[in-house]
Amino acid sequence: MKSKKKGKNLWRDHYTDKAQKAGFPARSVFKLEEMQKRWKILRPGQKVLDLGCAPGSWLKYASQIVGDSGRVIGLDLKPMDQPDKPNAQFIQGDAFELTQEFLDEIGRDFDVVLSDMAPNTTGIKNVDALKSAALCESALAAAVTVLKPGGSFVCKIFQGEGFDAFIKDVKKYFTKHKIFKPESTRKQSREIYVVGWSKKGGSHVRT
């Protein structure tokens, strides 16, 4: 038992230390980096929306990829310091309250929407999976609303109840999709990422 715990701690320390050395607040950056290396989801000059962006690793990484000609906006209910890059902005608020005033502020012309959000977990697998799926459905609705036709969507979800229904919804709005588990994710973790490409024309907000 001790050796297993030690192994888990070493795994956690490796990615945490690696992130800190690279100047990122959380090791989640390596999950996005893996997807970026594989598919080039982010490109210079793009406009990107990062839902639930705190503590800011994905926001910072995306801003580095899109460069000075691009723009990244991060949204989260939790407070966070403004990014130190001029092409990145943090807005504190509910990412799912897409009022007309808010849409006028951020626009409807995003190339990519990212969501690394996770629900507050209970430890009950089915309950946590359903909570994750509900969060992802809300993220998908936001993405479909603000993405340009042809845009891309990246979302973390827990495997389990609600997963298949979410994939069906992704297929409705995106021409192609992939399901991916990064190497930097714990093997025993049920979290997985869904990537949707080439958003179909039109928009729809779920109520």
Swiss-Prot record:
<feature type="binding site">
    <location>
        <position position="94"/>
    </location>
    <ligand>
        <name>S-adenosyl-L-methionine</name>
    </ligand>
</feature>
<protein>
    <recommendedName>
        <fullName>Ribosomal RNA large subunit methyltransferase E</fullName>
        <ecNumber>2.1.1.166</ecNumber>
    </recommendedName>
</protein>
<keyword id="KW-0489">Methyltransferase</keyword>
<feature type="binding site">
    <location>
        <position position="58"/>
    </location>
    <ligand>
        <name>S-adenosyl-L-methionine</name>
    </ligand>
</feature>
<keyword id="KW-0963">Cytoplasm</keyword>
<dbReference type="GO" id="GO:0005737">
    <property type="term" value="C:cytoplasm"/>
</dbReference>
<dbReference type="InterPro" id="IPR029063">
    <property type="entry name" value="SAM-dependent_MTases_sf"/>
</dbReference>
<dbReference type="InterPro" id="IPR015507">
    <property type="entry name" value="rRNA-MeTfrase_E"/>
</dbReference>
<keyword id="KW-0698">rRNA processing</keyword>
<feature type="active site" description="Proton acceptor">
    <location>
        <position position="156"/>
    </location>
</feature>
<dbReference type="InterPro" id="IPR002877">
    <property type="entry name" value="RNA_MeTrfase_FtsJ_dom"/>
</dbReference>
<comment type="similarity">
    <text>Belongs to the class I-like SAM-binding methyltransferase superfamily. RNA methyltransferase RlmE family.</text>
</comment>
<feature type="binding site">
    <location>
        <position position="116"/>
    </location>
    <ligand>
        <name>S-adenosyl-L-methionine</name>
    </ligand>
</feature>
<keyword id="KW-0808">Transferase</keyword>
<dbReference type="Pfam" id="PF01728">
    <property type="entry name" value="FtsJ"/>
</dbReference>
<feature type="binding site">
    <location>
        <position position="76"/>
    </location>
    <ligand>
        <name>S-adenosyl-L-methionine</name>
    </ligand>
</feature>
<feature type="binding site">
    <location>
        <position position="56"/>
    </location>
    <ligand>
        <name>S-adenosyl-L-methionine</name>
    </ligand>
</feature>
<keyword id="KW-0949">S-adenosyl-L-methionine</keyword>
<dbReference type="GO" id="GO:0008650">
    <property type="term" value="F:rRNA (uridine-2'-O-)-methyltransferase activity"/>
</dbReference>
<dbReference type="InterPro" id="IPR050082">
    <property type="entry name" value="RNA_methyltr_RlmE"/>
</dbReference>
<comment type="function">
    <text>Specifically methylates the uridine in position 2552 of 23S rRNA at the 2'-O position of the ribose in the fully assembled 50S ribosomal subunit.</text>
</comment>
